[in-house]
Amino acid sequence: RYYIQVAQGETLANWPEERLWDELAGRFDGISEQGVTRGPALEISIAPLRSYVFETMRHGRLFLAGDSAHIVPPTGAKGLNLAASDVAYLSDALIAHYRRDDDAGLTGYQAKALARIWKAERFSWYLTKLMHHFPEDGAFEHRMQIAELDYVAGSEAMQTVIAENYVGLPL
């Protein structure tokens, strides 16, 4: 899977498959001896780099989970993980409610889910800011980004933090 940052407002009509391959080849030129192996694209889409958390995940008997409650940018690959953890928390709570008349899980669902959601949001946004340049960023932000990339490249501790978050936090 490859991601190429495009300007806000771009459309797929501006990015035929050949242009995507040319852009990737240009970016990998000099980095990889093999270059880019071209082939048919399975999917081409534009994914907005946005985050959102709807902090009210329960209204009476209605519970929100997954994308209805939170959106993360694709950079951190956390969307499906968060949806699965929401469903795991909620299913445990519903089972306890219907089998044992225990509502503690339903009462605590929102707080428990949000604690994990905000950690994943933080990580996804960190990676997004680390890997992407935004038009509103100035010279200072660009230098900070380069300094952070340099720090990550040279710090085993920071690489461990990124790996732990990328693999996924425990339920």
Stretches found by the model and what they are:
Residues 1, 13, 61, 113-114:
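Short, cationic motifs built from Arg/Lys/His that form the positively charged side of catalytic pockets
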Residues 1-47:
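Conserved FAD/dinucleotide-binding core of flavoprotein oxidoreductases
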Residues 4-8, 68-69, 75:
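Short, histidine-centered active-site or binding-site loop motifs used for metal coordination
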Residues 30-33, 75-77, 92-171:
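C-terminal helical "tail/cap" subdomain of flavin- and related membrane-associated enzymes
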Residues 47-70:
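FAD-binding beta-loop-beta segment adjacent to the flavin cofactor pocket
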Residues 74-84:
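A conserved FAD-binding loop/helix module that cradles the flavin
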Residues 84-94:
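Extended, folded domain segments that form the structural surfaces/walls around functional sites
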